[in-house]
Amino acid sequence: MFEFGSIIVTVIAVFITIPICLYLFLTRHFNFWKKRGVIYVRPLPFFGNLKDVLLQKKYIGYYLKDIYEENINKPYVGIFAFDQPALLVNDLEIVKNILVKDSRNFIDRMVKVDESLSPLNANAIFALRGQKWKHVRTSLTPTFTTGKMKNMFYLVDKCGQQLVLFIEKFAKAENPVAVKDAVERFTMDVTAMCAFGIECNSLQDPKAEFSNLLHRIFQLSFTSAVANLATFFAPWVQNFFRLKLMDSEIEDRIRDIVWRAVHLREKTGEKRNDLLDYLMELRTSETSKLDGDDFVAQAFGFLVAGFHTSSMTLTFALYELSVHQDIQTTARTEIKDVLEHHKKKVTYYSIKDMKYLDMVVNETLRKYPAIPFLDRRCQEDYPLTQDLMLPAGTGVYIPVYALHHDSKYFPSPAKFDPERFSEKNKQNIPHFAYMPFGEGPRNCIGMRFGSMQVKAALIHILSNFEVSPCKETRIPLIIDPKPFNLMALGGVYLNITKFNN
């Protein structure tokens, strides 16, 4: 009887002790900001401050904007990503120090991917740290010079012409166009041609192999959402739960595609002046050697960074142009006038002359930034202000979406107004209040290419079609809370009418 009673007591003690120990472990850092006298958002065990985001109830950009606005007069506010303390920075002067002035101490991103879980993601430039990042960045930078962009433009323009033919089918049938699907096919074909050296032809063949592969990479699920969030905020969660960003079989398929393209070019001697050509030059370079997964990962990184962000920018730009016919008309008139001076050809230089189109794209990126925040990791203890010494290893987040929607910097932020970026008015935008591609040494290396393909697509569409809302168009748009990147819930459907001339 005594032994049985002892067992019962032991079992009860274990059941009580385990939850207590787990609670203490999960909340062990929750006094971090309190000890340092920093205002912070009260966290929950395990979730930290990310509960609504993890449960896919709120888009991450909206959530950080809420925190930003609740602490609008404070230079920074403490947050918790799962159990990890991090700092959300509101003050533009501090933002400048982190991204530019003292960037050496914040050169690494919080992004970290376990190589055993995803070798290609782990070795892509956006996930690298330290000297390896510096080596790869230095090696890749010449790939995106003006000369290289000009050489690749014919590939982008070819896809733009195919996009017109694709949309024409819907215009003739007088059917609404699923804009996201159409422009994803365009950016998919551009990326496949420039980064992988293959003609995907998704605009002509909806069942194209590369198209299916790409959709599998970006397929949404609860697990992939948690894995993405953990990658940016708390990499240990991804490692502990062994959360893969994509299947190993997909990575093997990407390797196969890249190496087949490389070996074919080595065999035939073909030169296309695309990204793959430039990567192949690096592969044999003595000073900038890239090979194996380091080589494949850069082509893959170009795919991940360029495909989704550019297609979303195009989707939102076309939506805004459809509901603002005056802006659409002004953009189309400029396109027509500029092309008249360039023998009616869309070229790299004709795009550079389209100032109003540039304003439209800039305003789209303001209202709908592809990346809702910037992340940096403090390398060494850093005096952020006189009152706060930021410990090494602390994550710092800059709420880009919130800054882009702050009425202090952009009056009537919900209004789509390209005139904000006119030569006269853009001088009124404080530096670091507008950062669609980041700032400093870790800004987006492919931003010029991304901008080029977005503008090329808009030129081809606006030159041939009028875009307008249809009965399926949601006005205003509702943002989907599930994806990490900005996306319209239910997609964007528009009427697109072909011009007779």
Curated annotation (Swiss-Prot):
Cellular compartments annotated: Endoplasmic reticulum membrane; Microsome membrane
Primary site of residence: endoplasmic reticulum
Highest taxon of source: Eukaryota
Binding site for heme: C444
Coiled-coil zones: none
Enzyme class label: oxidoreductase
GO molecular function: heme binding; iron ion binding; monooxygenase activity; oxidoreductase activity, acting on paired donors, with incorporation or reduction of molecular oxygen
Classification via InterPro entries: Cyt_P450, Cyt_P450_CS, Cyt_P450_E_grp-II, Cyt_P450_sf, Insect_CytP450_Detox
The keyword Protein transport belongs to this UniProt entry's keyword annotation: no
Family annotation (CDD domains): CYP6-like (cd11056)
GO cellular component: endoplasmic reticulum membrane
PANTHER family xref list: CYP9F3-RELATED, CYTOCHROME P450
Record-stated family: Belongs to the cytochrome P450 family.
Protein name: Cytochrome P450 6j1
Taxonomic source organism: Blattella germanica
Organism taxonomic ancestry: Eukaryota, Metazoa, Ecdysozoa, Arthropoda, Hexapoda
Gene that encodes it: CYP6J1
